[in-house]
């Protein structure tokens, strides 16, 4: 499948952002004392892992390697998760709302810009809704 540079770049960025999201959640779980809230965060993390692996499969299907910068996104996710965790539950939730809202804006913008297959477009639309749902969940906990 032929891929224009813009679409390839968007898919790589989506993958990188999902790598970061997984690490943010992974490092924040311990900051939540309530078992139900921790369970929600683990569920969100697993959802982001699904997004990451789906983007990995889209890249593979197009014969594209992930960006060599993905380890930087992994590290940034670790740092953001740990920093927000240092400031407690409210900081974790506020940070996650900001992260998820930004992800939703990027998904919306990239959907308009990329030349995606119908399958990719459907998944990306579903992932956009997931990001909005995560943000709403964290808002409800504040």
Where are the model-predicted features located?
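Non-heme di-metal
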Residues: 1-142
């Amino acid at each position: 499948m032929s891929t224009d540079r813009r679409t390839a770049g968007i898919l790589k960025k989506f993958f990188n952002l999902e790598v970061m999201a997984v690490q943010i959640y992974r490092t924040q779980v311990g900051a939540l004392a309530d078992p139900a809230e921790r369970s929600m965060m683990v569920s969100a993390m697993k959802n982001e892992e699904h997004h990451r692996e789906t983007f990995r499969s889209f890249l593979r299907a197009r014969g594209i390697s992930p960006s060599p910068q993905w380890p930087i996104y992994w590290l940034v996710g670790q740092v953001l998760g740990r920093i927000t965790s240092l400031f407690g539950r409210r900081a974790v939730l506020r940070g996650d709302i900001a992260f998820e809202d930004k992800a939703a804006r990027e998904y919306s913008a990239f959907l308009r810009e990329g030349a995606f297959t119908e399958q990719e477009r459907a998944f990306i639309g579903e992932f956009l809704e997931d990001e909005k749902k995560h943000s709403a969940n964290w808002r409800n906990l504040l």
